[in-house]
């Protein structure tokens, strides 16, 4: 673990009131976009959007825009989000000239083309135990210290089990894949409590320079790449208290783990060169289940030209959207 980093860069959300954050936001001239990537989350996304709009746009003007990126949903996710007051973009419709890939990382990468904030805050759409400080708390280190460029949330997790007691453990993939990988390859990041947390914030100026995996590897890749490009002190973390969300099956986590290992291998110079691999898993009686795991990574958004129907040259930079 990097000497002294944990003490310097670990915070609690209670250190900043929303009113204080608004003052810092005004003093620094910073604009903030909240992005909620969602796929088939009709049961939760509307409540999340409504609550955030009420507290962080209506009660205090902390957010400049709230965008839901609908990632190939087959349910009413888009309708629920729009009716709750979000601006909704279907990922497949954003910059169609650049093609489309399935996955969370694709939604976050494409969000750069439909948002305008200096800071992007990402919030998962499947939360069931949470509050709006999951958003506001992430902004404290960024608004207070210009040297901070990436902020990760950490929390006590409420697991889907009968006793429902909070635990300091990370998720299964965090404890079995991400944390050991960091310990072996990037030990300076071992102090990051929740390296795969879906709640994080980043300066646009940094994100637009990063390569972004289109799937679940986006959080690990962003963490490692920030460390490699800016140093560990550009990263901070904020404790948020309790967090509850829906969990994937063990087989589903196998695909996630595969993506994370690919992210780590690429950043360690060990490959892989393929855009996808086949993951073979086994069920009852040795029944074979084969999943194609996508390993595509999007290049830096800063290198992407304007859409074919727009002229070359700078566009007006508005919080309502970007060219």
Show which residues each predicted segment covers:
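Conserved donor nucleotide-binding strand/loop of the catalytic core
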Residues: 64, 78-106
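Conserved catalytic loops of nucleotide-sugar-dependent glycosyltransferases that act on lipid-linked
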Residues: 168-263
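Short aromatic/hydrophobic "clamp" motif used to bind/position activated sugar donors
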Residues: 120
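Acceptor/aglycone-binding surface of glycosyltransferases and processive sugar-polymer synthases
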Residues: 96-104, 108-110, 130-204
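A conserved acidic beta->alpha catalytic loop
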Residues: 70-79
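The conserved acidic donor/metal-binding loop of glycosyltransferases
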Residues: 124-130
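Terminal low-complexity segments of carbohydrate-biosynthetic enzymes
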Residues: 1-7, 51, 250-323
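N-proximal low-complexity "stem/linker" segments adjacent to membrane-targeting elements
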Residues: 1-54
